[in-house]
Amino acid sequence: MEVNVRKCEKMTGKLQEKMNSYQRVWAEVDLDAIWENMVHMKENIAPETKILAVIKTDGYGHGGVPIARMLENLDFMFGYAAATYEEAHVLREAGVKKPILILGYTFPYCYEELIREEVRPAVYRRDTVEELAEAAVKVGKKARVHIKVDTGMGRIGITPDDEGLQFVKFIMEHPGLEVEGIFTHFAKSDEADKTSANRQLELFQNFIHRIQSELGLDIPVKHCSNSAAILEMPQANMDMVRAGITTYGLYPSEEVSKDIVPLRAAMSLYSHIVYCKTIHAGQSVSYGGLFTAKKDTRVATIPVGYGDGYPRSLSGKGYVLIHGKKAPILGRVCMDQFMVDVSEIPGVMEGDKVTLLGADGPERITAEELGELSGRFNYEFVCTLGKRIPRVYRRNGEITEVKDYFENF
């Protein structure tokens, strides 16, 4: 036991040492927040309903593998959703065992590997069905699939009508395929008016009833709830729900209630000041000289820019936190640096910590606020944070893992 404790302390020390080297920029991901978000969402759905954690786009920028590993042993977790086979393959390579569903189109080149790895593709094209069936024969293993139904999104999926019913029948004629699930996706569930979402739900439920009554097929996993529906549409729970942005503690929109399920944002973003100087009236800052000082102004340079995914559209609009106070951005955000006004913050020095996302004392910068200021939205902000930013993972206050993309280039 003593040896194990020493090993653990040694590993923690190495991780802390590694994190200390990230002076330019780093993101911290609070795994406890993600765990709590999952538990709170589960409390708001039916006891028998499972959760599918959507961890596409590398877990919305948070890191898909560490999150999947943490959630792997939760009994109410059905599995994970990815956008591409490559994302699913990375999870399998990392030892993730639970089911993985690919939400979009899966290209034929990977069908055999997909079946071997028991990754579930969405199906809605006849050629996909035929090619998957052929691949299943070659591999000697059934391909489990989820049928995608378009009830109003207008993106991908079969129509919930006679033609769609014929497609389901077509799948049933291929013994190499096993229909594990069927799903649709709401277009407007994050709006206060749920008329459209309820109409989609009705179409989906009616179509499922037709599949059962006319084809005699009982599909085990029926799902349509996304993050917004988990919060506000309990009637849409079904067998499983898909937790996307809410997994990471962000709400789908400003119209969705924040009182039903408490969520805690998991990501923070930090840097350090690399240069401080005073400029005088008439001097400009950054490209284009969009900011010109009207008086003596104390300027701090932050070594982060749009090359890291920090939006250029925050130029002259955004702010950071230093010593628990707001420091507004001066002029344009550059590819690798931007400048802030620290005139009203006493004692600012080179090397001081800077909060770009998250809390510092009583002040907080949220992804929602940054999304609004930059003309984007919260999903986009966290998803587009670049690979130059290492991710540091904390559990119970301790660093448990560090993901440095430069080590894998």
Regions found by a protein language model. Give the residues of each.
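Active-site anion/phosphate-binding pocket segments in diverse small-molecule metabolic enzymes
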Residues: 2-35, 86-87, 106, 124-132, ...
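Active-site-proximal beta-alpha core segment in soluble small-molecule metabolic enzymes
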Residues: 21, 25-28, 33-36, 43, ...
